[in-house]
Amino acid sequence: MNMKKILVSALLVGAGAIGWWIYYDASQPGKYDAFAKCLEEKEVLFYGTFWCPHCRNQKAMFGKSDKYLPYIECSTADGKGQLPICNEQNISGYPTWEFADGSRETGELSLAHLAQKTGCPL
């Protein structure tokens, strides 16, 4: 009976520790939060699709700061078509970055290149 209490107590403590760690980690800012927010302030747009491996790689460069990216999803839900917003902008490859001066670059861009192109501090 004592072994059962010890096991249950250990499981509860472990579950509590895991819950605290998940909460703590989620509440911490991402490494590139300010950089991603700056891109949006500089009127940069990031066109991509959920099925594009290069788009996923580009987002992964930002880690959990990717939620602040000025991202525009171009794919229909079934992955077989392009949404009107991207069609109207003549987006033909992914990822496509559009800058305030109207210039565009397609493909995975390094964070350093984005910083240089936009003036956003990395």
Describe each PLM feature range:
Residues 1-5:
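Positively charged n-region of N-terminal signal peptides that target proteins for export
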Residues 7-21:
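Hydrophobic membrane-insertion alpha-helices, especially the h-region
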Residues 76-85:
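Structural microenvironment flanking redox-active thiols in thiol-disulfide oxidoreductases
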